[in-house]
């Protein structure tokens, strides 16, 4: 048995042969080169504003500290999905994913339906209703003045 080395005359044939049509657009090669983009940005900083959409906006640099790290964010998403999938099927069937359900819950127009489905704590419902009534009374009294 012979072992292959880097000094062998005989080279192994390539294993991967891509004969499909390429999805890359060759003319974009020079436009999207990182070296070219950095060079253009150094020559003319306003070049970057074309990508941002606002020519008056100044670039901002710095860290954005967050109390959450990636693992915490993943756990929050997992808990949200778990809560969504623990709902009864007759409620879940109206929503294709947890995000759609959450946006529906946050819409004030759906508040009565959320209450009818029993998804809210009855005590919190009463507190919210009394607060809304109080706010409406204040608006009416301020409009009368």
UniProtKB/Swiss-Prot annotation:
Keywords: Host cytoplasm, Viral capsid assembly, Viral release from host cell. InterPro entries: Chlamydia_phage_Vp3 (IPR014131). GO terms for cellular component: host cell cytoplasm. It is found in: Host cytoplasm. The keyword RNA-binding does not apply. It comes from the Viruses. Participates in the assembly of the viral procapsid in the cytoplasm. Released from the procapsid upon genome packaging, possibly through affinity displacement by the protein ORF8, or by proteolysis. Belongs to the microviridae B protein family. This is Internal scaffolding protein VP3.
């Amino acid at each position: 048995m012979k072992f292959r080395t880097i000094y062998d005359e005989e080279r192994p044939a390539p294993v991967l042969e891509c004969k499909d049509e390429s999805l890359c657009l060759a003319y974009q090669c020079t436009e999207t080169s990182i070296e070219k983009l950095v060079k253009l940005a150094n020559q003319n900083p306003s070049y970057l504003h074309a990508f941002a959409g606002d020519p008056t906006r100044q670039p901002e640099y710095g860290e954005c500290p967050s109390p959450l790290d990636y693992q915490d964010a993943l756990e929050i998403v997992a808990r949200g999905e778990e809560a969504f999938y623990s709902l009864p099927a007759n409620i879940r069937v109206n929503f294709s994913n947890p995000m759609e359900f959450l946006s529906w819950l946050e819409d004030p127009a759906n508040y009565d339906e959320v209450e009818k489905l029993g998804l809210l704590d009855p005590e919190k419902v009463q507190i919210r209703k009394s607060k809304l009534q109080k706010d409406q009374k204040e608006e009416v009294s301020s409009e009368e003045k």
